């Protein structure tokens, strides 16, 4: 178990590792602005700027954590060989399980207990 970007760095450093997208789990992340923030409009502009596909394509040159803006793939902003290394590439994403925040909000406590029990047996 691990993050694809770390596996890819290890592989580039000569480690004998591999992984398969058919067993991958996609997770959700997000940006937030605290309620009452003084510079809310500026923060919104900053987030919008960071989400631009050209910046995401540039970032993906350095680590294989896939862009979250699908336009990176639609516009062909990455070399095809690099794009196919990303978990968010459509050919890879379709084989992965996407975590359900609704499920975890309901079952978090029980799931954590069961996971801890499984890992400590």
Question: Where on the chain are the PLM-derived regions?
Answer:
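Helix N-cap / beta->alpha transition motif
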Residues: 3, 68-71, 100
């Amino acid at each position: 178990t691990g993050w694809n970007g770390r596996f890819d760095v290890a592989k580039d450093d000569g480690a004998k590792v591999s992984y398969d997208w058919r067993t991958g789990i996609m997770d959700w992340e997000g940006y937030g602005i605290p309620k009452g923030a003084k510079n809310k409009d500026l923060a919104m502009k900053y987030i919008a700027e960071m989400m631009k596909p050209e910046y995401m394509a540039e970032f993906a040159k350095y680590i294989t954590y896939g862009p979250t803006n699908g336009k990176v793939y639609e516009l062909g902003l990455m070399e095809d060989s690099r794009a196919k290394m990303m978990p968010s590439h459509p050919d890879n994403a379709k084989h992965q399980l996407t975590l359900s925040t609704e499920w975890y909000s309901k079952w978090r406590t029980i799931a954590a207990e069961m996971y801890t029990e499984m890992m400590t047996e």
